[in-house]
């Protein structure tokens, strides 16, 4: 009987996740030259006429690459579907999906994730070229608040988060890179963006030094930056980051001056 009850609970829980993910509209952006990018869109639950809403760009990790337009919701989407968050923090939320052969900020996977060995001269990747076009279409919408554009990502997506803020610091009010890395010499360009960085000190995939050095570089540049390091946590620090009690409030409190 207990096993049956556990199965029923699990079944309805999974059903709820699938149903919730269906609230993210399936979209495909196609450029004039024919390049495309899959993405999912969550709209504010209630859109008031004349109201402007923040826009959040969420960049997934390497494990969620593909072409199914679903895997990118595996981490992070439930946070946005939480009824309390839906009510208190209405926003347009974009979850693009990086192609299997792509790597968000880079044309190929960096040979080392140690910050001093990360590329310092980074050409715009094909995936980010299309993503920037997609982002521009939403920035042109009158219901999007241009002063409250946020970006966050985990692992490969955190590397993309750093890269986007370096290239387009004028766009983003705040950024949350989780267990990422970047060449710290590039970060001076992003000093006007407010950062909140997370990492686990036992991460064996992306060394924690990536976040430590990013924090130091941003701090030295005069940026508004906060760093949280989780003791004993490996390459899953997003699970703890998403449950920080002030996670949403901090993000949605940020606004471009």
Language model regions located:
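A domain-start/cap signature at the N-terminus of enzymes
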Residues: 17-55, 91, 127, 133, ...
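Gly/Ser-rich "nucleophile elbow"/oxyanion-hole loop immediately N-terminal to the catalytic nucleophile
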Residues: 46-51, 105-154
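Alpha/beta-hydrolase
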Residues: 57-59, 178, 230
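Bacterial Sec-dependent N-terminal signal peptides
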Residues: 1-23
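Alpha-helical scaffolding within the catalytic cores
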Residues: 74-84, 179-187, 209, 213
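C-terminal catalytic histidine-bearing segment of alpha/beta-hydrolase fold enzymes
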Residues: 194-257
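Active-site machinery of serine-nucleophile hydrolases
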Residues: 62-128
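Primarily recognizes the serine-hydrolase "nucleophile elbow" in alpha/beta-hydrolase
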Residues: 136-191
């Amino acid at each position: 009987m207990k096993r049956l009850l556990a199965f029923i609970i699990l079944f309805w829980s999974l059903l709820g996740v699938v149903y919730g993910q269906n609230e993210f509209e399936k979209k495909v952006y196609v450029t004039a030259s024919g390049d495309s990018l899959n993405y999912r869109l969550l709209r504010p639950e209630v859109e008031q006429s004349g109201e402007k809403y923040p826009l959040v760009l969420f960049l997934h990790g390497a494990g969620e690459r593909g072409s199914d337009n679903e895997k990118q919701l595996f981490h992070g989407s439930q946070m946005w579907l939480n009824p309390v968050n839906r009510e208190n923090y209405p926003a347009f939320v974009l979850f693009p999906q990086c192609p299997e052969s792509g790597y968000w900020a880079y044309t190929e996977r960096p040979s080392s994730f140690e910050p001093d060995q990360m590329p310092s001269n980074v050409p715009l990747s094909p995936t980010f070229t299309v993503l920037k076009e997609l982002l521009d279409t939403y920035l042109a919408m009158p219901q999007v608040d241009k002063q409250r554009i946020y970006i966050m990502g985990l692992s490969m997506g955190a590397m993309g988060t750093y890269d986007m803020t370096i290239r387009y610091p004028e766009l983003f009010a705040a950024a949350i890179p989780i267990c990422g890395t970047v060449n710290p010499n590039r970060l001076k360009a992003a000093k006007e963006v407010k950062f909140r960085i997370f990492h686990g000190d036992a991460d064996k995939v992306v060394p924690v030094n990536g976040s430590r050095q990013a924090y130091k570089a941003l701090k030295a540049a005069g940026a508004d930056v906060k760093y949280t390091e989780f003791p004993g946590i490996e390459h899953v620090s997003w699970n703890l980051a998403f449950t920080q009690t002030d996670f949403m409030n901090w993000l949605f409190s940020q606004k471009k001056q």
